Amino acid sequence: MPLSYQHFRKLLLLDDETEAGPLEEELPRLADADLNRRVAEDLNLGNLNVSIPWTHKVGNFTGLYSSTVPIFNPEWQTPSFPKIHLHEDIANRCQQFVGPLTVNEKRRLKLIMPARFYPNSTKYLPLDKGIKTYYPDHVVNHYFQTRHYLHTLWKAGILYKRETTRSASFCGSPYSWEQELHHGRLVIKTSQRHGDEPFCSQPSGILSRSSVGPCIRSQFKQSRLGLQPHQGPLATSQPGRSGSIWARVHSPTRRCFGVEPSGSGHIGHRASDASSCLHQSAVRKAAYSHLSTSKRQSSSGHAVEFHSFPPSSARSQSQGPVFSCWWLQFRNTQPCSNYCLSHLVNLLEDWGPCTEHGEHHIRIPRTPARVTGGVFLVDKNPHNTAESRLVVDFSQFSRGSTRVSWPKFAVPNLQSLTNLLSSNLSWLSLDVSAAFYHIPLHPAAMPHLLIGSSGLSRYVARLSSNSRINNNQHGTLQNLHDSCSRQLYVSLMLLYKTYGWKLHLYSHPIILGFRKIPMGVGLSPFLLAQFTSAICSVVRRAFPHCLAFSYMDDVVLGAKSVQHLESLYTAVTNFLLSLGIHLNPNKTKRWGYSLNFMGYVIGSWGTLPQDHIVQKIKHCFRKLPVNRPIDWKVCQRLVGLLGFAAPFTQCGYPALMPLYACIQAKQAFTFSPTYKAFLSKQYMNLYPVARQRPGLCQVFADATPTGWGLAIGHQRMRETFVAPLPIHTAELLAACFARSRSGAKLIGTDNSVVLSQKYTSFPWLLGCTANWILRGTSFVYVPSALNPADDPSRGRLGLYRPLLRLPYRPTTGRTSLYAVSPSVPSHLPVRVHFASPLHVAWRPP
């Protein structure tokens, strides 16, 4: 007989009106393969091969074939970034604050000071791929908005700018591992000896250099550890070669000034004397190139003097440029039409410099004039479409045979989070502004994380079919005017109102490397999680009567009363600011007693999903079609949403197993009215996940394939199955019987599958029912040899093993609570003691 919905409800024990047999008879029936097959057929769960066209959209969920078209906003504001500088001695500052750090805290802080990134191999892409043509209708607008965003990041000290093959410049405060260059000289900041001659010491820089003459550049080969010294002739590179910024040292022998002070006192002292003026003739440049600081091969193919003109002439490039600049070339030409760019270029007398240099120059490993990832802009988030966010695509490191396997780190699961945070504390959450950009990257990582652009001329040339620019050679003037068009002219005129003289600066090629960790690399979330968890660990030890917890950049503080929380907030904020961590005070949220964290609402009653997720699920069920095959890609999105809320339903994850099966088979899934009604009933009533309590286990379950046994206190029970069952199924049934007979929330078992509380591998009906019966039950592992229920399960009722005293302590998982936080009293004291709430009495860990 075909199964009716009522029958199905009866089987799932979800309906009290229909009479069900005793649990001991009903449950083993649910494990029957034949019954599960019939139910699957009745609910159309197994019929994966369908010939009707698939549905690719359900509500807001789209499949593989209909991705949402990104919307470009010409009014996007570039967010401002504070001058973020995380203090290098962060570990020492934490020690002053809380006393000696634990091993875990030290290790994590060392990991991010500085962060290192060495992929197995790096694929270099042409500069044209630097800014992605993500918005075909707004190409020029998107180009300038992105360039402005990159410029903002560079000014904020988040990016390096590649100056030559081996040097880069940046803004902001330098770190000790960033070796500075001054006019082509490497400067090592150490104590001065022999007058003011720099003394050779071993710098903690990019290069591990030999102790003999480490101040003079030798040839370096790149290795997995950045740059290693390579024995070879000294400074043999040809004069004028792009990439060598080092002044040539005229003495061929290697010297260290600490040993032989009479030698060449300053490295390349003639280099700075002979830094030639800007308008030297090409002949003199060639003749003196071994004395002047080396020429830089700019990405547009014209040699520029590096660091050789006085700052006063920085903005006066337009008066007598030495090299041909695509933008300024328009000034001296006849307009080719009403929409010629020369009209725009003649609007302004002084277009500013062609390139800007940072406040500091450092040496870097050899960096080609290429990019390793593309960038584009999107809305900052769904709620803030006024500001833009930069998306960096470094997916090459996660693909192919040379992909980097990113380190794994513990994400708190729902139960751990509830055990930890479900209490009657007052909560607030802190917003760390630009959290990723706090963590410094070693300059040796720069060649692997390059972004940039080939300049406006190449960008426009790629898009206009009538123009051909080969290898940066700007040929005749006719070629120059090939890029003039009405669309470009109108776009640039509008942008001129926004950016003014910077249009010229942004039209030049640029190559930038990351100085802080970028968001598009799998290493970054790991590093951020390590960083914030270590900081929270320090805060927890400094304020033992409070709770601080973090996941990525989401930091929450809890205290017993609102007044206490406010004083804690002040102290913690000051501490974080002293480390160089930037908080956004406008985004501090005070939650009262119900904390909103990681998509959950956590209170003293337990945890539930946040309201916007519940609304999304309701909306999703309203739009869900029945008897129509739904694309498995859409099912993936669906399962993602329903899976998040599954622990709050009666049947949990097992209820979604038919959907998982269709995704695995990459087949369409058809919802029958019955299955949809069953699921929607599950999700309309959500139950909180409660905090586990410590206790003493007094109920034990055990099973063999043929029978089960229970030990409830001093009482023993046993029974046999009608037919032999697989051992895991039998153990699960025994646990269900123990729960239903004793009502205990703490059960001892020797089966690892039951302990894991993942019931998705059992027959579908049994998995759903077991999840429903065992919801909120905690399990304790007891070895078979000590299990009091072992004998009854084998049919031996006469033998009594002594009842174990098995204490149970709820776990907070691996949620980075390195310093054990003292337990928080569960009641609010009548009067909070305010003698000194922030006094730190340090005790050894």
Swiss-Prot record:
Organism: Hepatitis B virus genotype A1 subtype adw (isolate Philippines/pFDW294/1988)
Family from the record: Belongs to the hepadnaviridae P protein family.
Domain Reverse transcriptase: 359-602
Any further remark recorded for this protein: Hepadnaviral virions contain probably just one P protein molecule per particle.
Function recorded in the entry: Multifunctional enzyme that converts the viral RNA genome into dsDNA in viral cytoplasmic capsids. This enzyme displays a DNA polymerase activity that can copy either DNA or RNA templates, and a ribonuclease H (RNase H) activity that cleaves the RNA strand of RNA-DNA heteroduplexes in a partially processive 3'- to 5'-endonucleasic mode. Neo-synthesized pregenomic RNA (pgRNA) are encapsidated together with the P protein, and reverse-transcribed inside the nucleocapsid.
SS bond partners: none
Binding site for Mg(2+): D431, D553, D554
Region (Polymerase/reverse transcriptase domain (RT)): 349-692
Name of this protein: Protein P
Pfam families listed in its UniProt record: DNA_pol_viral_C (PF00336), DNA_pol_viral_N (PF00242), RVT_1 (PF00078)
GO terms for MF: DNA binding; DNA-directed DNA polymerase activity; metal ion binding; RNA-directed DNA polymerase activity; RNA-DNA hybrid ribonuclease activity
Gene: P
Notes concerning its domains: Terminal protein domain (TP) is hepadnavirus-specific. Spacer domain is highly variable and separates the TP and RT domains. Polymerase/reverse-transcriptase domain (RT) and ribonuclease H domain (RH) are similar to retrovirus reverse transcriptase/RNase H. The polymerase/reverse transcriptase (RT) and ribonuclease H (RH) domains are structured in five subdomains: finger, palm, thumb, connection and RNase H. Within the palm subdomain, the 'primer grip' region is thought to be involved in the positioning of the primer terminus for accommodating the incoming nucleotide. The RH domain stabilizes the association of RT with primer-template.
Chain positions of site Priming of reverse-transcription by covalently linking the first nucleotide of the (-)DNA: Y65
Taxonomic lineage of the native organism: Viruses, Riboviria, Pararnavirae, Artverviricota, Revtraviricetes
InterPro entries, alphabetized: DNA/RNA_pol_sf, DNApol_viral_C, DNApol_viral_N, HBV_DPOL, Rev_trsase/Diguanyl_cyclase, RT_dom, Viral_Replic_Matur_Polypro
Activity regulation field: Activated by host HSP70 and HSP40 in vitro to be able to bind the epsilon loop of the pgRNA. Because deletion of the RNase H region renders the protein partly chaperone-independent, the chaperones may be needed indirectly to relieve occlusion of the RNA-binding site by this domain. Inhibited by several reverse-transcriptase inhibitors: Lamivudine, Adefovir and Entecavir.
Biological processes per GO annotation: DNA replication; symbiont-mediated suppression of host innate immune response
